[in-house]
Amino acid sequence: MTICQSANNPYADCAAHYVESRKLSELVLDEFCSKTGIFKQNVREMDDMTGTNWSQVPTVIVEMGFLSNVSDDRLMATEYFRQEAAIGIANGVDAYFEWLETSTVDENATGDQTATESPTETDIS
């Protein structure tokens, strides 16, 4: 599971980063689950996490498993899983930066953000 703030987060300007944080969370979750084989849960939007509430940049919190789950606990204790988890998270961050290169985040008159694809060279000429 990954966690990001909601679009309506009442703290600071973190809502300004919602679209990017949501996309980062989705990509990290996809890559993490693909690499580790962990059951994919959804991205959770929460507004009670200090780590996301006051951030000035897009954020993601990664829950790699549940210590209350014996299977997860044993799995997270292995070097192999931790290495695969790190690779999956890194792949997700790389995918996010690739997405940023091909997308722009536009702010409309209501202050909401939407992600759009950047124009290609053929669109410009």
Where are these regions (language model features)?
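Active-site-proximal helix/loop segments of hydrolytic enzymes
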Residues: 1-125
